Amino acid sequence: MRALILLSLGLLRVAVPSPPQVVVYTYKPVVHGEKNTLLCHAKEFNPPNVELQLFEDGNVFSQANQTDLSFESNWKFKLTKFIELIPREDVEYSCHVMYMGKTSIYKLESF
């Protein structure tokens, strides 16, 4: 009986929606004119229906790569979108995160 109660509590925790925690960053410190990787990492979300898109001055990077969706030991998910680029000054880099019908925009702040 105790195992059934613990299982029920665990499933209840999984059933509660949890929005993603998102960070946008570069693999290395930004040096203009040098190749780098722009990443958008979303974690701690459930259910796993999230979409990430990387943008440069409002234009989507259609060739961006994405990791496979995976989950942590707490049954919350994580996903990363990334693209190799040469960062340019005066350009805004951002990640649009679509989750449960809502879009949130996160900007790269390291410039």
From Swiss-Prot:
Coiled coil: none annotated. GO terms for cellular component: extracellular region; MHC class I protein complex. Keywords: Immunity, Immunoglobulin domain, MHC I, Secreted, Signal. InterPro entries: Ig-like_dom, Ig-like_dom_sf, Ig-like_fold, Ig_C1-set, MHC/Immunoglobulin. Residues 1-17 form the signal peptide. Gene3D superfamilies: Immunoglobulins (2.60.40.10). One of its GO terms (biological process) is antigen processing and presentation of peptide antigen via MHC class I. Residues 20-111 form the Ig-like C1-type domain. It is found in: Secreted. Heterodimer of an alpha chain and a beta chain. Beta-2-microglobulin is the beta-chain of major histocompatibility complex class I molecules. Belongs to the beta-2-microglobulin family. Component of the class I major histocompatibility complex (MHC). Involved in the presentation of peptide antigens to the immune system. PANTHER family: BETA-2-MICROGLOBULIN, MHC CLASS II-RELATED. This is Beta-2-microglobulin.
